[in-house]
Structures are given as C-alpha cells and as structure tokens.
A protein has these predicted regions:
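Helix-start (N-cap) detector for alpha-helical repeat units in TPR-like alpha-solenoids
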Residues: 27, 61-62, 95-96, 129, ...
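Register position in tetratricopeptide repeats
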Residues: 39-40, 73-74, 107, 141, ...
Length: 197
C-alpha cells in the first residue's frame, strides 16, 4: 500500500495471459476477464465475476487471491484481510497471500503482525524479493516507533534525533513517489486440477 510503502502482489494482463497458457483457455479466460475488468476501473463487476467463479470452484487459490486483491483495491481492508487469511489457512504453502496480508496489517499500523506474515512468506519462498523489501519497510517502521518512544522517554538524548531523521527521510522519499513502482507478482499457482474443486 502506498501510504505504508509496502508492495502488494497484484493482477496484470501479462499474468492473465500467462495463466491462459498454464491453466487452459477456459479457466484462464475467467482470470483474464476479471483482471481486465479491474484494470478498466470496474472493480464491482470484477468482484461479481470472481465471486461467481469461486461459487463453482471454491478451492481455486488463483481466483480467491484475485478476489483478495480486488477487495484491497476497493479499500475494503477488513474483507481483504479475511480473504487472504482464509487463503493462508487453506493453502499454507503459498507465500503470496502472506505478503498481501502483511501489506494490509502494515496499513493498519499492526507492524508486528505484518512482520510475522512476511517472515512466513520468506520461509516459504526464500527468494521472494518483494517480501524481503516489505520486511525491510516494516523493520523501518518499527525502528521509527522505537526511536520515537525513546525520545519521549529521554528528550535530552543526543543520539536519537539523527536516527529519527534518517528513518523519517527514508519513508518520506518512498511516499513522494521517488521509489520505483512495485513489480507485479503473479497470483499463486497450483497444478491444474489439484484443489480446484
């Protein structure tokens, strides 16, 4: 989420097209349609189509992941949190839902929960660069909180102001849009037919 400088996995046309090849045209068309509706600024239609698909295939992790992304994009953080939490319970081996769950927790200022979710994502996928970057952002936020509290307790400290300034500058740069745009990560993939019913 922009205001906490965490990067979320999201849906893109390239991913939808890749899914077409991997999952077969009929199923992938559903993913592509939902992704296209979301990109066209029609999140309500995208959500309705995702919900209809999930009604027939409730164990499909890709569409459930897309549904969580749609809810996040709609600003429905509580619903998105439920969606991603359910994914982590049903498919604990998938790192992407943990990453998105962490972004939602961080947006709410729940940095300890965000850290735990990101550590799980990294344990599941040790080369998950986005999760590592997000974990760094969470540690930065936790550092800012700790330095701020320490300064409240010891206003005369000479070592705290430069540390606070450094951490604040780090996040001010990210919030002004100077930081690179987040990369697009695919929704979780499963073997065709496995757990899709």
């Amino acid at each position: 989420m922009k205001h906490v400088a965490l990067r979320k996995s999201s849906v893109s046309l390239a991913i939808a097209l890749a899914l077409c090849m991997v999952l077969g045209i009929a199923r992938a068309d559903e993913y592509a349609d939902v992704g296209a509706l979301l990109r066209q600024g029609k999140p309500d239609e995208a959500l309705a189509k995702a919900d209809a698909y999930i009604a027939g295939k409730p164990r499909d992790p890709q569409m459930r992941f897309m549904r969580g992304v749609i809810l996040s994009e709609q600003g429905r953080g509580a619903d998105a949190t439920v969606a991603f939490t359910q994914l982590t319970q049903d498919f604990p081996e998938l790192p992407e839902p943990y990453n998105n769950l962490a972004a939602l927790y961080a947006a709410q200022g729940q940095f300890d929960k965000a850290r735990a979710a990101l550590e799980t994502a990294i344990k599941l996928k040790p080369d998950y660069a986005t999760a590592f970057e997000n974990l760094g952002d969470v540690y930065g936020r936790l550092a800012a909180q700790s330095y701020g509290r320490a300064q409240q307790l010891d206003a005369g400290s000479k070592s705290l102001p430069p540390k606070l300034t450094l951490v604040r500058q780090l996040f001010a740069t990210a919030q002004t849009g100077v930081a690179a745009a987040p990369p697009i990560a695919p929704p979780p993939r499963r073997t065709v037919g496995k757990n899709s019913k």
